[in-house]
């Protein structure tokens, strides 16, 4: 879904809009499918449409934006949003009178395959359109465009049916929409970094709860160094030496030093 590396919160465009813009419906035929055959058919149709659009159509365009933010506790971090636009029409055709068709500096094309009859759609599914809008904002801001077209291309595989929706946005309008999206999502990213900060401060104050047994401190040091060096450590120690605490405690300390983000402690059912 997302990843946090240091002070960078990284999320894909699709995961961002699905988290922020998804609307409830028990009918998931309009929101995609995990069926392998359907996904393969959708990929084939994507390629077919992309190849039919000519030289002006740029397929699978990678886009990324980094947004500097500050949490409620004053933690500075970067929100990185990235993904691939299905298509971008960067050069627009001109009609006989020399006018652009349509009047946009570029068009973002988002292609969605559905199992329902797309000809019955009256408007784009909002979460799909939101994905295209994010791509549109990133592209328009980086290319300094005054306006951009957002096109949703819906396809039903059998019988093959295509339904398109095209809407033009000024940069000010799409920027306002994007800023509202990020402001809403910032609540969650702020929480992530603020809680990490609280956790780190708590770990730094943590002391080993007992007096070290014989060999226990050396074991803690070995585990910590293995985590620090990102290496495996194999330990053979007698029962009663305190292996559980001697491995978990240095792992928690390493967590406080941001050497890792999570701890997984796996053990057998009856012994540790």
Where on the chain are the PLM-derived regions?
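Polybasic (Lys/Arg-rich)
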Residues: 173-204
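Walker A/P-loop
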Residues: 228-250, 262-263
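Conserved Walker A/P-loop ATP-binding site and its immediately adjacent core
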Residues: 262-272
């Amino acid at each position: 879904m997302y990843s946090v590396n240091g002070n960078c919160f990284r999320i894909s465009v699709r995961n961002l809009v699905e988290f922020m813009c998804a609307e409830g419906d028990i009918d998931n035929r309009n929101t995609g499918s995990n069926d392998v055959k359907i996904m393969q058919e959708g990929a084939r149709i994507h390629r077919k449409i992309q190849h039919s659009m000519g030289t002006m159509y740029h397929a699978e365009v990678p886009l990324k934006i980094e947004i500097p933010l500050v949490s409620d506790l004053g933690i500075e971090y970067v929100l990185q949003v990235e993904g691939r636009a299905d298509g971008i029409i960067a050069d627009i055709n001109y009609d006989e009178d020399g006018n652009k068709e349509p009047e946009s500096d570029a068009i973002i094309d988002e292609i969605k395959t559905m199992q329902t009859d797309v000809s019955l759609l009256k408007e784009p599914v909002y979460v799909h359109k939101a994905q295209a809008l994010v791509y549109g904002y990133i592209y328009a801001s980086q290319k300094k465009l005054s306006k951009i077209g957002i096109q949703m291309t819906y396809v039903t595989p059998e019988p093959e049916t295509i339904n398109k929706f095209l809407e033009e946005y000024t940069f000010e309008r799409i920027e306002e929409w994007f800023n509202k999206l990020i402001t809403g999502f910032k609540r969650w990213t702020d929480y992530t970094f603020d809680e990490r900060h609280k956790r780190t401060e708590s770990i730094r104050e943590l002391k080993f709860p007992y007096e070290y047994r014989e060999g226990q401190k050396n074991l803690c040091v070995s585990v910590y160094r293995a985590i620090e060096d990102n290496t495996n450590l194999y330990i053979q120690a007698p029962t009663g030496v305190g292996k559980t605490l001697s491995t978990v405690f240095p792992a928690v300390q390493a967590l406080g030093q941001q050497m890792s983000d999570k701890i997984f402690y796996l053990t057998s059912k009856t012994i540790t």
